[in-house]
Amino acid sequence: MNSTESYFGTDDYDNTEYYSIPPDHGPCSLEEVRNFTKVFVPIAYSLICVFGLLGNIMVVMTFAFYKKARSMTDVYLLNMAITDILFVLTLPFWAVTHATNTWVFSDALCKLMKGTYAVNFNCGMLLLACISMDRYIAIVQATKSFRVRSRTLTHSKVICVAVWFISIIISSPTFIFNKKYELQDRDVCEPRYRSVSEPITWKLLGMGLELFFGFFTPLLFMVFCYLFIIKTLVQAQNSKRHRAIRVVIAVVLVFLACQIPHNMVLLVTAVNTGKVGRSCSTEKVLAYTRNVAEVLAFLHCCLNPVLYAFIGQKFRNYFMKIMKDVWCMRRKNKMPGFLCARVYSESYISRQTSETVENDNASSFTM
């Protein structure tokens, strides 16, 4: 079997996965690609993991200690932060795998990491669609917003549970088929389709579900909702409308910049699954593109807290309170007593006052 057949065919080692490390098959040597990924991918994943954890933990801390989730957007933001945290926690395992060019962990951890990786990636994308619709209701349907959002808020947790359930269902092939096995004297954690009669069909099904729910669904929601939001803001006589429009445009552009390359590579891979006859140079270009595109896609974990939470004035205020309290805790070790009690007291009073005057249906996100 030549390199193209192995790369896009029905070989046990399924390199159609966008996060795979391309092995060296036949006359087409991808050693230079592996040398690139050994350095680039671990560094990129480590940075995404660190900054993604910091930003999303701040969001969770804000809801846990300073601000109750009172609106639909709050519930979505909290779930998205949890999703991103779980997602970035899988990246160190893949960083080690790329650096060592082998899977050094157990078979159970292989299934768990691949499954967690897929579930949280898809869940995060679906939550972006939910946030888009919530903003559409709040801004475009402003006259009906209070009634609609109040009624729907009761079911917001149910909506999030449904999103998690759908994400688990569409990611189930990842849990089922991924396993640890030996290939060319090294252990890999990849899908293996020996147990099914139509392996290419299962590959295409998995990629199709990811493309539909992980890209096209949130894209359609965002395009529809944000076009009407921009139209409404342009017509509004509001001094802050220009800033709001810039925020909307930034959200859409960041989503497109992060997700289009990754999903185009996935689409090309799906179209060419089972085909033969591609040149070695084409394989190398696709391998490079796949690794760079996935890093771009994963940047959303770092950018989501900024674009969807801390861009709002209220969240920035809570962020400053967190910083003050962290500073206070450090000072407490040196100067125990009134200083920390004073800061915590002011924070507590401020929180109570804010929650008293704030409408129960108000969102912590303000554009």
From Swiss-Prot:
Gene3D superfamilies: Rhodopsin 7-helix transmembrane proteins (1.20.1070.10). The chain crosses the membrane at residues 40-66, 76-96, 112-133, 152-172, 204-230, 247-271, 296-313. GO terms for molecular function: C-C chemokine binding; C-C chemokine receptor activity. GO terms for biological process: calcium-mediated signaling; cell chemotaxis; chemotaxis; DN2 thymocyte differentiation; DN3 thymocyte differentiation; isotype switching to IgA isotypes; leukocyte migration involved in inflammatory response; lymphocyte migration. Residues 67-75, 134-151, 231-246, 314-367 are cytoplasmic. Glycans are attached at residues 2, 35. Residues 1-39, 97-111, 173-203, 272-295 are extracellular. Disulfide bonds join 110-189. InterPro entries: CCR1-9-like, Chemokine_CCR6, Chemokine_rcpt, GPCR_Rhodpsn, GPCR_Rhodpsn_7TM. It comes from the Eukaryota. GO terms for cellular component: cell surface; external side of plasma membrane; sperm flagellum; sperm midpiece; sperm plasma membrane; sperm principal piece. This is C-C chemokine receptor type 6. The gene is Ccr6.
